[in-house]
Curated annotation (Swiss-Prot):
InterPro entries: PC_trans. This is Phosphatidate cytidylyltransferase. It is found in: Cell membrane. It is a multi-pass membrane protein. It catalyses: a 1,2-diacyl-sn-glycero-3-phosphate + CTP + H(+) = a CDP-1,2-diacyl-sn-glycerol + diphosphate. Its EC number is 2.7.7.41. It holds the Pfam family CTP_transf_1. Keywords: Cell membrane, Lipid biosynthesis, Lipid metabolism, Membrane, Nucleotidyltransferase, Phospholipid biosynthesis, Phospholipid metabolism, Transferase, Transmembrane, Transmembrane helix. It comes from Staphylococcus epidermidis (strain ATCC 35984 / DSM 28319 / BCRC 17069 / CCUG 31568 / BM 3577 / RP62A). One of its GO terms (cellular component) is plasma membrane. One of its GO terms (biological process) is CDP-diacylglycerol biosynthetic process. Its main location: membrane. GO terms for molecular function: phosphatidate cytidylyltransferase activity. It comes from the Bacteria.
Amino acid sequence: MKVRTLTAIIALLIFLPILLKGGLILMLFAFLLALIALKELLNMNMIKFLSIPGLISALALIIIMLPQDAGEWVQVIQLKGLIAMSFIVLSYTVLSKNRFSFMDAAFCLMSVAYVGIGFMYFYETRSEGLRYILFAFLIVWLTDTGAYIFGRLMGKHKLWPVISPNKTIEGFFGGILCSILVPLVMQMFVDLHMNIWLLLLVTIVLSMFGQLGDLVESGFKRHFGVKDSGRILPGHGGILDRFDSFMFVLPLLNILLIQT
């Protein structure tokens, strides 16, 4: 418990100033977190990060995370670059004489999309304003807190025992219920540019998909037989263990709220 608490304090002391500052430093921080998260995923599948497919995946990740407002050249690089990376990774299945399988290639490409899109929207959301990233973080935090409390007090029906045996249906809906507090309170202080009823609906959707993101990462770990995605955060696991919900919440937040 002491290690877990100390890790959380140190992480917050590093993370919060960068989040508040935003801009280039946050974007570079997002790239760093994404590369670590990609390494964690590849390690689960016994693919070394410092290997040909690992390094190609890392390059593809950087390409997919390039800022969208940098100009048309970014979209050109992303399209042509990702097509080229896909062909190279697929070709390596032959060059490696099937030691690197087609399933491994598909896993690399899926990992790049999963991690890259999630962390790209991390800094893109912050660039739209601190209120939006705060909105996302509070939804995820209150959902997790509510799911834990309701699950402990009332949880009797397992949500998905094969993937995450501790999660319950009562906790799932308890998390959604607690997340509703976020827009109700935030609208008193900041303008989120949406009717409160629509905002409540968006919050419910984000809470549901945040929990789904948690289950997806749990599914990865269960499939590959690992307890945590990594060990970079003592007592907390890896980067993916901390950001799994945001992989789903942040892209959806941009689609449903920011880009509307």
